[in-house]
Amino acid sequence: MSLIVKICGLSTPSTLDVALQAGADMVGFVFFPPSPRHLELARAQELGAQVRGRAAKVALTADADDETLCGIIEALRPDLLQLHGKETVPRIREIKRRFGLPVMKAIGVEIAADLADLPRYAAVADRLLFDARPPKHATRPGGLGVPFDWRLLTNLSVDIPFMLSGGLAAGNVDDAVRITRAGGVDVSSGVESAPGVKDAGMVRDFIRAARAAETSLREATSHVP
């Protein structure tokens, strides 16, 4: 299976076009006001129309209520909802029932105990995203540019696909993929020149590095007896 590359926190037509032309599989749009990447619905509608089926559209939310989710879905028409807050298993189940969209649940990781509830989340989500657990007093649940110990995911066994996030950049994505064997990588701050400001060259470099990491891993595993 091919490695999924997601560029998250896109907010301008030009950087979205760069991500699409460089071959991103998923493009993420943030709907969380404390984030410098937050989008108003009118802008989200414009950017969503620009995608035109060239990549999967992902709406990132955190503990959003039904009214908020309804507005986001109407504006963006996402292919996937990324739940990046403290959504419970019953809440995830309710969101899927009400809106009929697949869900990717973000799991904050710092220590092995943070993975204890994986079976419960895997039973209701369609995909998992492992991100660094934010510091105690952080105002945002992600996009902080901080990695976690990827070795915690070594030999991970879950029944649904998972992606990796948290502190990824062109310079470390090869190690990240090799250690975790993640099915996808998700980057935001690692392709920015300033918080919320995507850098076209960094976006291209990351996607290129992720594809190279995918090739290296495939070649390495093909030689395992």
Swiss-Prot record:
Catalytic class of the enzyme: isomerase
EC number annotated for this UniProt entry: 5.3.1.24
A Gene Ontology molecular function term of the record: phosphoribosylanthranilate isomerase activity
One Pfam family cited in the UniProt record for this chain: PRAI
NCBIfam families attached to this UniProt entry: PRK01222.1-1
Annotated protein name in UniProt: N-(5'-phosphoribosyl)anthranilate isomerase
Protein family membership: Belongs to the TrpF family.
Protein species of origin: Nitrobacter winogradskyi (strain ATCC 25391 / DSM 10237 / CIP 104748 / NCIMB 11846 / Nb-255)
